[in-house]
Design a protein with these regions (language model features):
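Active-site mouth of glycoside hydrolases
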Residues: 2-237
Length: 237
């Protein structure tokens, strides 16, 4: 596979420009395109108060573009969360404003409200039927690869997330589980705010919650009938 990223408004050309764009990328030899940052405030959820409902006009443009890629034999990949605007209260936390996107990603494995918000948008997108193909995204053979969360690993913003109540609760529960087998495990690190992002104990914690999250997400994707291969290892640099 040899591809390019399309970011933000590049995912929503008018139909005439979409025809030209697809033809040009094919002539250049590309056979894969990543639809990236498509769910920004001006993208697929434009105007949605809850940040979950799909915008009909933006989706029409995206649907047409994707249909043209499929028609030309170009595969598509995307992420189920990159930068979608999410309000704190939309995930059940009584706080004004929006959740920082990296903080939100790190809340998904440890906070039920954040997970359900992720799952609801994923369902809205993947069950959406592209009128230009007649197929739902989950059934699209031209969409064989899906990243569950873009760059969601904990070490990116551990210093910001470790003081949040859901993360502290998850940390305490994890320590209790580990200490049931080894009473001296992570001695002196009951408070996650004392744990550095480079510590071995954080890596162990991160690996455990990541495994549990991905198992849950995979089961959910199977429940929805998703055909694509899945990954949660798009971790940036």
């Amino acid at each position: 596979l040899y591809g390019v990223n399309l970011c933000f408004d590049a995912n929503f050309p008018d139909h005439a420009f979409a025809d030209k764009l697809v033809d040009r990328l094919v002539r250049l030899g590309y056979n894969t395109v990543r639809i990236h940052h498509y769910e920004s405030a001006n993208g697929a959820v434009k105007g949605a108060a809850d940040g979950l409902a799909l915008n009909a006009e933006r989706m029409d443009r995206l649907d047409y573009l994707l249909a043209k890629f499929y028609e030309k034999g170009v595969y598509v990949t995307t992420d189920l969360f990159t930068c979608r605007p999410v309000a704190w209260r939309a995930i059940g936390i009584d706080r004004d404003g929006r959740v920082d996107q990296q903080v939100y990603k790190n809340l998904i494995p440890v906070h039920e409200g954040a997970y359900q918000n992720w799952a609801t948008f994923a369902k809205n997108l993947l069950t959406h039927v592209n009128p230009y193909t007649g197929r739902a995204y989950k059934d699209e053979p031209g969409l064989p690869l899906i990243s569950l969360i873009n760059e969601g690993h904990l070490t990116w913003c551990w210093r910001r997330i470790r003081g949040e109540a859901p993360m502290k609760k998850a940390w305490t529960a994890w320590l209790a589980e580990r200490r049931a087998a080894d009473a001296g495990f992570a001695k002196g690190l009951d408070d996650p705010e004392k744990v550095s992002e480079s510590s071995a104990v954080l890596i162990a914690f991160m690996a455990d919650i990541e495994r549990k999250l991905v198992a849950r997400q995979r089961a959910y994707m199977k429940e929805l009938g998703v055909k694509a291969l899945l990954t949660n290892q798009n971790c940036g640099s």
